[in-house]
């Protein structure tokens, strides 16, 4: 094999799959003989283990030791084993505990009946208790270079088989693995909590338990999804919040499901008891909002810590478990980027999962896959699995998942997982410190599997005994975590039973008085954390705003982003596009869609509004029209024209996303809820695929304002249009978005000209109105010679909610008016022009905004044609799809009494479109001819 220099290897990405075998071979050779590899690699490999307390052992050596052990009979006399072989056996024992110790860790508060794993027994390595007094090298396992086997074995049992089970041995990064090993073996066992810390942990458990008991007696039978059994979550979050602030984190966004949410609201977030009681008693006034149940409510507040205040936000959450995860990540990314750049340690995501949903919901995998991508990384999230070992009525792991642990999906991230017994609150707090320190060191996700139980049924009124009799017999006899820990501290004389009783009484007294249970800052002092949404409250969609720009400015901006460095070696097609854009910028040729769209972005960036556009092919554009990022054909180097407009411009964030819809759209929605001053766009590769993200659309985008009073200006680009590409590449399912529209909750538009998309995008940001915008974007129309605009359309025009007839006809001679939306207009226009002068009795009106519907504009337009008795709605989509059913009553409302409304389009169809090209052409020609009476 030829020698490869380090520089060459890095250029080819030495972490790539096709290089993995080669680099592993080099590393194995290095471990056997450092001089067997060249100096560059030798130096590099040494940096991997620099500072590690234990040297790596090559896989070949370990395999050979196992072969040697297998060849020797078990009854071999200890005296016959050489000291080197004994040391190797001890090395394997240590490695075995690092890899498999978690299998016998005491992590289940209800008792663990797992058999002892043979790989954790001395005999597996040909060692016995008779070897206990022999001395071996420890390689940093203990605080001395050598120790007896008994000391080593005892230490291994204490570290790896106590209340904490650790999984980190499969992490591929040597530096991370060494860091975790040293932390687990050196720092974690040395953590000693002082008296005050232990008393604080107990006080946190008192608050967790006392709240649930108080609510259980005050609001009998009301559903609250009690935390009981998982009480250690409260000291965990308390420690996490305080330690995060000490490490300079200023904001934490927490997302969680319903279990324990009420407890977190009061005991961590600082919501007052009086506010919560209003929810229980149904006294909260939501006005015109629908509101939501108390265990879905979000909250935000500045909580005091001894290191300063920290802003905590608990994300609003639907019952659709885990879909909040990418939403919370997006919110954190926006908060980080608001700080004059992507500051990963300014804000952090804490995700609290259920064991059943974490291993069961596919959105979890999407969120994890996003965590290290350029478009979506947030510097690492803390994941807490509230593992109560049951999902509603399903407690058999063979039904709940196909893996040993509910956390096993985390292995895909090469991330550490810490399983911890919820009945050992000190271990819980210690693991919390470890998890946060790892996140801060490596900016990667980390997982805490908080193994606990659910004291009641799924709801407080639900009886779990019919389906989990054995488990709940144990739970009924099992003391609470607070009881166990209080007993422990009382026995150690760190507190008295009377003190504990007094803490409980004091807590209940504060609840009786409706007080806050956590010290927070007054709301007026916390404004610097939050984006200012005040200008957007109470605004109407009809608010007018000037979206034009002076012609001179338009030309200058167009020239800036269309002029690329001469050093770039462009693809010939891309070069032609940018050459054409320069001519458009000069006004020599009409502009196409791609130019107008880029011009809209450039203008907003120059005015100080950042632009974030993310989708599976968004940098180039699925249909090769955008090219917001261009690539040097010789070096592969990227160049983003929109980053080079001016020194004071805002930042563009244009990324290709990973191949997912729900997670990616959820992320962008979350981003948009935390930054009203950015144009945030998620683009589907084809509109057809957006229904993979239907939960995000249904539970967040369309209803977030109504349920939670949450504004969002997110934009959805959904390529839509019937062009013979079959049922999976034709329809964005327009009908579904229109069906969701009510109370001006969002906007649905189908712009058909470049000037329309320019004004539409600028309106979305410049107008003091923040509601989601669904845009049916074109495909073939991107290059349709009829779909062009001039610079004057941008300098003097505005967004038209509908576009009237564009050709000159005598209004009195018009007897038939065709109303349509989207690409079908150009099919109608082309066909009408084929029949020159023969169809002058037909006028065509494009409705560009389908919701909120432009009643006044359409009514005024129809009034222009006094003799038009026939009004036609023409659409490409089947009759049971498209805009027809959701729009016809609106059309009728705008018509005169002497007018009739007819439908022209495809018949009702189970599939969105025909799969056969010939059938598509036939049906398309039929509907166009029928609309034009040909």
UniProtKB/Swiss-Prot annotation:
CDD domains: TPP_E1_OGDC_like
Needed co-factor(s): thiamine diphosphate
Keywords: Glycolysis, Oxidoreductase, Thiamine pyrophosphate
Pfam families associated with the record: 2-oxogl_dehyd_N, E1_dh, OxoGdeHyase_C, Transket_pyr
A biological-process GO annotation: glycolytic process
Catalysed reactions listed for this entry: N(6)-[(R)-lipoyl]-L-lysyl-[protein] + 2-oxoglutarate + H(+) = N(6)-[(R)-S(8)-succinyldihydrolipoyl]-L-lysyl-[protein] + CO2
Its EC number(s): 1.2.4.2
GO cellular component: cytosol; oxoglutarate dehydrogenase complex
GO terms, molecular function: oxoglutarate dehydrogenase (succinyl-transferring) activity; thiamine pyrophosphate binding
Assembly notes: Homodimer. Part of the 2-oxoglutarate dehydrogenase (OGDH) complex composed of E1 (2-oxoglutarate dehydrogenase), E2 (dihydrolipoamide succinyltransferase) and E3 (dihydrolipoamide dehydrogenase); the complex contains multiple copies of the three enzymatic components (E1, E2 and E3).
Protein family according to the UniProt entry: Belongs to the alpha-ketoglutarate dehydrogenase family.
NCBIfam families in alphabetical order: 2oxo_dh_E1, PRK09404.1, PRK12270.1
Functional summary from the UniProt entry: E1 component of the 2-oxoglutarate dehydrogenase (OGDH) complex which catalyzes the decarboxylation of 2-oxoglutarate, the first step in the conversion of 2-oxoglutarate to succinyl-CoA and CO(2).
UniProt-recorded name of the protein: 2-oxoglutarate dehydrogenase E1 component
Organism: Coxiella burnetii (strain RSA 493 / Nine Mile phase I)
Organism lineage: Bacteria, Pseudomonadati, Pseudomonadota, Gammaproteobacteria, Legionellales
